[in-house]
Swiss-Prot record:
Transcription keyword on record: yes
Entry keyword set: Repressor, Stress response, Transcription, Transcription regulation
Pfam family, one: HrcA
PANTHER family, per the entry: HEAT-INDUCIBLE TRANSCRIPTION REPRESSOR HRCA
Descriptive protein name: Heat-inducible transcription repressor HrcA
Domain of life: Bacteria
Family: Belongs to the HrcA family.
Main function: Negative regulator of class I heat shock genes (grpE-dnaK-dnaJ and groELS operons). Prevents heat-shock induction of these operons.
GO molecular function, one term: DNA binding
One of the GO BP terms on file: negative regulation of DNA-templated transcription
Classification via Gene3D superfamilies: 3.30.450.40, Heat-inducible transcription repressor hrca homolog, domain 3 (3.30.390.60), Winged helix-like DNA-binding domain superfamily/Winged helix DNA-binding domain (1.10.10.10)
């Protein structure tokens, strides 16, 4: 546990380093800390903080910079978030961006607004497409070809083209749609499949054929899993802390391309309440100590369905990025729930 003097100096050092990007020396700490301390006393405290692994001294400078461990202590115990006025400005921007519309477009807009407001990379883990349906409609395209339209409880509209063994008239398709919606709406397609086995003797053959085809078309699609949307990854090329080492930056862009570890991180974050902050290697996202990830889950009708966040340098203004992520998650939840 740090004493108040050491806490003040560490907080001042991190705030100045975030603002200026240069190692912080004792003269700067004396000027901004508000403490009446001699340069020698400040240097002694800095030496103690270095022994604790909270700051390091680059070889080319007499000043010091925070370590990931130092950032962690700062974020957990010393951080003051932006003022109410700043949060209101963020809220207005996010509300304007997240206009009602198709859920996929709203989620993509959330990734974009995260990137634009933070000036880093915005990421959103999209909801896993529901195998539960709210409504189904069949539309005849041509002989033995039918368009299956599925509406999920989240408001997502999915289209499938079905090839059938025989032709169906428009009236038969309407009858099948009405029957399915009346008897099976709100169930998963696996439940529908199970119910069909139980009720097959009570149904006409053509009705059974259509429903089996609909269930198969709905559950055989490979795009029902979660996906990651990324916006503004090129912003990271403008971050001096990262662009100075292109080899490490290429590793990060490989992660963006493959998305597997990013999906795993966001999936883990969705099981925690509120904003989560992963500093340096805590994320296990990339072998880059200079990266941090700020995430928050979002909901539809009170149920967590995904995660969003910002990826940027450890030298990010956490007091500004945390409200951006938190507000975007809350407003995305509200917008999707109102669909």
């Amino acid at each position: 546990m740090l004493d108040p003097r050491a806490q003040t100096l560490l907080k001042t050092l991190i705030e100045r380093y975030i603002a200026e990007g240069q190692p912080v020396g004792s003269r700067t700490l004396s000027r901004y800390s508000g403490l009446e301390l001699s340069p020698a006393t400040i240097r002694n405290v800095m030496s103690d903080l270095e022994d604790l692994g909270l700051v390091i001294s680059p070889h080319t400078s007499a000043g010091r910079i925070p370590t990931p461990r130092g950032y962690r202590l700062f974020v957990d115990t010393m951080l003051t978030v932006e003022s109410a006025a700043d949060e209101e400005a963020v809220t207005r921007t996010v509300k304007t961006t997240l206009q009602a519309g198709e859920p996929q477009k709203i989620v993509a807009a959330a990734a974009s607004v995260l990137s634009n407001l933070s000036q880093f990379a915005g990421v959103v883990l999209t909801p896993r497409r529901s195998h539960v349906f709210k409504q189904i409609e069949f539309m005849r395209l041509s002989d033995k070809r039918i368009l299956l339209i599925i509406v999920t409880p989240e408001g997502d509209v999915q289209n499938r083209i079905m090839a059938t063994q025989r032709d169906f008239s428009p009236s038969q398709l309407v009858e099948a749609s009405n029957y399915i919606n009346a008897h099976f709406a709100g169930l998963s397609f696996d439940d529908v499949r199970r119910r069909l086995r139980e009720e097959i003797d009570a149904l006409r053959g053509d009705m059974t054929t259509l429903m089996h085809a609909a269930v198969t078309a709905s559950t055989d699609e490979s795009d029902t899993g979660e996906t990651v949307l990324i916006s503004g990854e090129r912003n990271l090329l403008e971050v001096a802390d990262l662009s100075s080492d292109m080899a490490r930056l290429r590793k990060l862009f490989d992660v963006f391309d493959q998305k597997t570890s990013l999906l795993q991180l966001l999936d883990v974050s969705s099981h925690a309440a509120g904003v989560q902050i992963f500093i340096g290697g805590e994320s296990n996202l990339v072998p880059i100590e200079e990266m941090s990830v700020v995430t928050a889950p979002y909901e539809v009708n009170g149920k967590i369905v995904g995660t969003l966040g910002v990826i940027g340098p450890t030298r990010m203004a956490y007091n500004r990025v945390i409200p951006i992520v938190d507000i975007t998650a809350r407003l995305l939840s509200l917008t999707l729930s109102q669909q």
